[in-house]
Regions:
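Conserved SAM/AdoMet-binding glycine-rich loop
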Residues: 134-227
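Short acidic (Asp/Glu) and glycine-rich catalytic loops that position anionic groups and cofactors
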Residues: 41-50, 69, 77, 106-116, ...
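Extended, regular secondary-structure scaffolds
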Residues: 1-11, 85, 118-126, 132-138
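Cysteine-centered iron-sulfur cluster-binding motifs in ferredoxin-type domains/subunits
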Residues: 96-108, 119, 127, 131, ...
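N-terminal pre-triad scaffold of radical SAM enzymes
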Residues: 82-111, 129, 142-144
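Generic beta-strand/beta-sheet core signal
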Residues: 71, 97-102, 108-113, 123, ...
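Cysteine-cluster motifs in flexible loop/terminal segments that predominantly coordinate metals
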Residues: 55, 59, 80, 89, ...
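Flexible, acidic/Gly-rich N-terminal and inter-domain linker regions that tether
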Residues: 1-93
């Protein structure tokens, strides 16, 4: 059957179901096209049907992320869970702050690149500080921010300037097997945000509990983040 050049066909559902190699091929093609700039439409045959997946939308920009995190979330589980003993895991994230989205690390064992994409977008400093200040009105808050992180805590920049126009590289990874020479590396803004949060009245300590990419960290010529 004719398949347009603007479309990438994955191995059929039946082939993926029966063959590990076809499963791997389908997964790789899906990851390669998961880019809002250059990603193509994906199709996969499923019996007499054809599944169509449209190209990814543009990731939320800073203004949009700020809006999402400005909404009046309850920061607690619904009352119906009380009879089941509550939700113990809520305490791990109750007073944590997400400052970014996306990860260009693309580790083989990790699914972050699939469900958040490789393009990194961030919230503004103002939005992050306002969320921290909102904790002070919560009677459960004891002064400890458990995490200021995200998929990868120490990513505050796009991987490179080229990705804005050309998208992320299809057949290369930014950090492996060796860091790309075009990669932007800086922890200055992230460190500044952490310090401003720590200095807020009512904040005792600020922690990082999300993963830190050390291979990215050691590429930074400024070693202040280590101190």
């Amino acid at each position: 059957d004719y398949v347009p050049k603007s479309v990438v066909e994955l191995p059929s559902y039946e082939r993926v179901k029966e063959d590990k190699r076809d499963y791997a091929i389908a997964s790789r093609r899906e990851l390669e096209e998961a880019d809002a700039v250059r990603g193509k439409t994906l199709i996969q045959r499923h019996g007499k049907y054809i599944l169509v997946q449209n190209p990814p939308m543009q990731p939320l920009d800073t203004k949009q992320l700020d809006y999402v995190y400005s909404l009046p979330y309850e920061r607690w589980y619904r009352e119906c869970y009380e009879s089941l003993g509550g939700v113990p895991g809520i305490n791990e994230v109750l007073f944590s702050i997400t400052h970014n989205r996306g990860c260009f690390g693309a580790c083989n064992f990790c699914s972050l690149a699939f469900h958040q994409g490789r393009a990194v977008t961030v919230r503004s400093e103002k939005s992050i500080i306002e969320e921290a200040e909102s904790f002070l009105d919560n009677p459960r808050f004891k002064g400890y921010i458990s995490d200021v992180g995200g998929p990868t805590a120490n990513f505050r920049l796009p991987s490179c300037e080229k990705q804005k126009k050309l998208g992320l590289c299809k057949n290369r990874r930014c950090l492996a097997p060796t860091p790309c020479p075009n990669m932007q590396v800086s922890h200055t803004e992230y460190l500044d945000i952490l310090r401003k949060l720590r200095n807020l009245k009512g904040i005792k300590k600020v922690f990082i509990r999300s993963g830190i990419r050390f291979d990215y960290l050691i590429e930074d010529e400024n070693d202040e983040f280590f101190r």
